[in-house]
Amino acid sequence: MRVALLSLIAPVTGDSGGAGGALGGASPILPRGLMRLGGHTLARHQLAIALALGCDRVIVVAPGGLDGLLPLQHAAESAGALFHRVSGAHGIMGLVSAQDEVIALGDGVLAWPDLAQELLATPTVLVQPVEQGVAAGFERLDFNYASAGAMRFPGRLVERLSELPGDVEPFACLQRIALQGGVPQRSVPDEVIAQGRWNLLHNEREIQAVEPDWISHHLFEDGALQPSEWLAGQVVRLAGPALLEAGSGGTVVAMAAGVLAALGLVAGGFGALTLGLLLVALAWLGFACASMFGRFERRSLRLPRPRLAPAVTYRWIVDGVLLALLGLAHGERTYVAALFEPLMLLGLIRLVPAVVANRKAAWMEDRALLALVLSLLSLFGLLRNGVAVLAVALLLGGIIMAGRQNRLTST
């Protein structure tokens, strides 16, 4: 069995120095691990790393009177892991067998998840140069190295805690035991430290300093971005922390976007097609923001699927509203005739990017851009013919790009 060991002992401090103390004394008002980053506690982000590394059991060392662990327990158990809370080092021993592997993360350590998975893939004690490590608040190990606040070691070493007092700080002691037991050291790459992708956070000021980069890292994926996706990313970077801290995140944004789409449909029903199309453009931007929130949560917490509706649902909603609005633009014609051209346009917008591997083709899927173009056509009284012209242009553009793509692949 693979066991995760998390600590909620060291308190939030007003400066950036100092390592976590022992378990003795009064319980801290707020441990570092319960500070929130991107709407979730540092302990929850550490749990995501542990679960991604295949941990089946989660042990949290925390003072007896500490509240706030229930969400962490629910997250662990919903992922199929066993959850245990202990108040001291000796409580760990009965939960780890000699055949187990232990993955331990120190108080307040924040690591980029993909990086942590790579560095902790094998048994190791992660270290860093002593100057930068001690300056950041990590424990000094020897003349050359400081701790990096993470390690993976055999479970048989846990039994050595029985030789120590019960009020020692478990991570620091197990780190020494692992090094004495022959677990190899591995240095965190210098560029990782320099880029701020491996941190020890002591207070809210330090949380706020790393939060923008943390959010940006988990927002954007490889590949071409639609204009509305880029704009949504900037909105989430600016307003995201406040919404995430409030606990609403993308849910409120998705609901607001749904209201805008409904208002656009109502406006079109009353003959204000230009206004309706502008509202649809705003609705798509809102849905893009909600998708960004879902992507951030999925990637930062290593979730198998987002908790919000998938982007394909938002696409169907907006396409349905656009189809209705464009159909209303042909009010005197039969329903079949009124919907034919809009159906061809929306169908080609879905089809061409799917069959053409071209970065520019991704722009065709941007419903906000489409709605803005359609609103301009409506403003100048060109909507009916404009839909047909856009459909033909998409068809010809798709044929040309597909032909170029075939020539490139054949050569």
How should each PLM-predicted stretch be described?
Residues 229-306, 310:
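Core alpha-helical transmembrane segments of integral membrane proteins
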Residues 1-66:
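N-terminal glycine-rich phosphate-binding loop and ensuing alpha1 helix
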Residues 63-114:
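Short phosphate-binding loop-to-helix
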Residues 70-74, 97-99, 109-183, 286, ...:
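Conserved core of the sugar-phosphate nucleotidyltransferase
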Residues 15, 144-265:
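Conserved alpha/beta core of the MobA/IspD/sugar-nucleotide pyrophosphorylase nucleotidyltransferase superfamily
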Residues 308-411:
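Generic detector of multi-pass transmembrane helix bundles and their immediately adjacent loops
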